[in-house]
Amino acid sequence: MVRRTHGNSQEHVTKHIFVTGGVVSSLGKGLTASSLGRLLRSRGIHVLQQKLDPYINVDPGTMNPFQHGEVYVTEDGAETDLDIGHYERFLDVFLSQKANVTTGQIYQEVLRKERAGEYLGQCVQVIPHITNEIKSRMRAQASDDVDVIITEIGGTVGDIESQPFLEAAREVRRDLGPDNCMFVHVSLVPYISAAHELKTKPTQHSVMMLRQLGISPDALVLRSDRPLNQSIKDKISLMCDVDAEGVVNCVDAPSIYDVPKILFEEGLDAYVVRELGLPFHDVDWDEWADLLERVHHPKHEVNIAIVGKYIDLPDAYLSVTEAIKAGGFANWAKVNVKWVAADRCETTEGAAAALDNVDGIVIPGGFGIRGIDGKIGALKFARETKLPALGLCLGLQSMVIEYSRHVLGIEDANSSEFEPDCANPVIATMEEQKDIVAGKGDMGHTMRLGSYPAELEEGSLVAELYGTTHVTERHRHRYEVNVAYKDRLREGGLRISGQSPDGELTEFVELPQDVHPFYVATQAHPEFKSRPTKPHPLFAGLVKAALDHQAAR
């Protein structure tokens, strides 16, 4: 543990590392923060992570996936930024709602306090009231058993929206002291092909802008598409007044899982340990080295399609993609993810063409009627051709609708989400969600969210894959399998292989293995609990089934 000495007594201090970004967005601040966190964790240091998002939305739960990408759900039901998924996967930890803070949350709380009279008549201002609230969120995860909090500040230095967050970070350093706080700035060193030169000026200007806000970075992570020589690093060290040891190069890598190794070889984690006075232990590479061996030296290769409606922005399915890849790692297989627009699969011919040369499909979650007929068409094709299929959330609902229409003969089977007055709503609005759907309540943070238990049926494929009949998974939905149709589904051959403990909510469905080798769906989002070093059993099972399908061709 990290201690601060006061006379003869010692007080634990949770230290802070702030990760900022400059020049352009999408440099990989989240992956840099995650990789540094992984390295510190591998040195025996207890690390938690956090993302501060400058947008005014309270959370990303109501944002368009094409704008924001995936909404990542935590164990306690927070709808968060996709970077929280990177943090959990790299550190192999469960984070809470404290891990994601937005401008909307900050202003909402400050205005609540103002209306309640908690500021005792003060004129409420950005400084100190907004910044104090930000600081309290920054420190919310600090405790006696947490050594370091790594906080990623979203956006790019110079954005007007992020200035209160940067000011709050500056004040945290002032409050805790420079020995307990560190700033890591991620910047771009672009290559100008016409001049055949790498340019340092953008980084110099980015650091200058950061200094104008009262922050001098302690370390620079320089992103580039080719290695930087020592003379460029030395120049940046001099011009930006950063120790030479703190200037590291993170060149583009074949896999995101290579980034911890790159930063280690550049010495970033050792530099951070020294600067913050953390206990020095060697990095335990055993688990990560095994992962990299599976990433770079697979024994098999297989194609799996994601049939979705947001495929133009792959980040909308980031955790699904990473979970599929992790399922490949479990089987020493490289998985080539094929992106298939659901609309292409609305007809039998379209599905056959779109899913040609794939050995498995995933039907991910989503909202709204667009693309639903294509998802149903893809599942019909997979069921009839014995193509391995895994449905997630809306994927389960699509599987139930498809089976009801084409096997049970309920031609007008549908979901009340898509057809509120349908005669056969095999998928119905959850009772507690009806007022929300009717417009009588807030849409934000009102779905069935977070971790819930399920009981699996003995002898089912899902119970075999999990190795237990008691599981918990994370959820994000308003609709469920209509209990009035459960007996009819069972009698028609669709196995309800997992339910909520009270037996009301259908959590898993599947076809018996003598009917189909792998036709499984869950109402949950198991992708959120997958780790590259601990692949989720459903995704590992899908990849294994895909390899078997490939071998049988």
Curated annotation (Swiss-Prot):
Entry's Gene Ontology cellular component terms: cytosol
UniProt gene name: pyrG
Keywords: ATP-binding, Glutamine amidotransferase, Ligase, Magnesium, Metal-binding, Nucleotide-binding, Pyrimidine biosynthesis
Keyword field contains Acyltransferase: no
Activity regulation (record text): Allosterically activated by GTP, when glutamine is the substrate; GTP has no effect on the reaction when ammonia is the substrate. The allosteric effector GTP functions by stabilizing the protein conformation that binds the tetrahedral intermediate(s) formed during glutamine hydrolysis. Inhibited by the product CTP, via allosteric rather than competitive inhibition.
Protein name as catalogued: CTP synthase
Chain sites annotated for binding CTP: 25, 159-161, 199-204, 235
Function summary: Catalyzes the ATP-dependent amination of UTP to CTP with either L-glutamine or ammonia as the source of nitrogen. Regulates intracellular CTP levels through interactions with the four ribonucleotide triphosphates.
Residue numbers spanned by region Amidoligase domain: 1-278
Glutamine amidotransferase type-1 domain location: 303-552
Reactions this protein catalyses: UTP + L-glutamine + ATP + H2O = CTP + L-glutamate + ADP + phosphate + 2 H(+); L-glutamine + H2O = L-glutamate + NH4(+); UTP + NH4(+) + ATP = CTP + ADP + phosphate + 2 H(+)
E.C. number(s) listed in UniProt: 6.3.4.2
Residues noted as binding ATP in the record, renumbered to the chain: 26-31, 83
